Amino acid sequence: MVLRHTEHKKKQKMKKHKRLAIVNGGMKFYALAVMALTALTACTNDGVGEVINHETAEVRMTFTPYEMEPMTRANSASGLTRTDGVTRAAVADYATRLDVWIYDGDTEVQAVHQQSTDEGFASLSVRLEKAKTYTVYACAHKAVGAATLSNGVVSWPDDKVTHSFFYSQTFSPATTTTLSCLMERIVGNFRLEVTDKVPEGVARMTVDMGDSPTRWDVGGFGVNAVSRVSSFTPAVGSSPTLSVFVITDGEEAEIYDITVTAYDGEDAVVQQRVFEDVPIRAGYRSTYRGEFFTEAIFSMSFTVSDWMDYETVDF
């Protein structure tokens, strides 16, 4: 009887130890779960539950369209006094749309399309992987719709060229989280200022640039050269100004022969003038000013605005 009682006590102790082991194991599991939950909570942003991946970084970008230099600085090579005044213009002053594309190699990661009426126009934030290297491409312009980027070429609706700027930069979020993107003009401007009055019977005027690029290769040059004719409808009795933007690249001016024609309602020619050897260069404006409808001799002079004006011709 004593032996059986002793064995019974041993069995009870073994059962008790098992229960303690189960309880202790459960407490350890609970403690691990609490630690994991605490660690997860520590990785949230301001307690709102958004988990931050420490393998990524937020990259902020702001865009300005170009750096404006006084004429004396822009032309210091020609003997004018150099000055140091430099200002930057806002994108919204010169563009109504901003299109941004972010690429990982040849793969588009993200595209952002903004309009000047959007809050925060010309600025954005994106979250990208730290371990990768990206390239950002951006185009500011005044086209009626968003630009597209395909196979390294930027194009606009109907291939219509407007006042346009471009920017590209390769960066790594591991070392760069802020980009101040100074955009450059990729167009030159031909401007015709008519000083006499549009006579009765004139229904429209056209500016024929001949063949010129209508798209922009991100490598830094214009492509898709086609014949471009821009049409305008001036009011009778007005002195119109006709303005055409031309995609150009490089440091040298492209030379164009530009034909301007006035038509009546039956598409008969009322007046036509050909402007030969017109220099068109990115960031520069070539202005011709004078009487168009009378038989006047054309002369040339150039004015300066925010563009680094190439030359102005009085005719």
Q: What does each model-identified segment do?
A:
Residues 115-118, 143-180, 266-295:
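Structured interaction patches on ligand/partner-binding surfaces of diverse proteins
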Residues 39-42:
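C-terminal motif of bacterial Sec signal peptides marking the signal peptidase cleavage site
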Residues 180-187, 246-251:
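Conserved "repeat-terminator" motif of extracellular CCP/Sushi domains
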Residues 185-203, 211:
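Surface-exposed interaction/gating patches
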Residues 4, 17-20, 45-124, 128-135, ...:
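Acidic/polar, low-complexity intrinsically disordered N-terminal segments immediately downstream
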Residues 15-31:
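Bacterial N-terminal signal peptides that target proteins for export
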Residues 85-149, 201-282, 312-315:
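Tryptophan-paired
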Residues 1-13:
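Short, Lys/Arg-enriched N-terminal segments with co-localized hydrophobic residues
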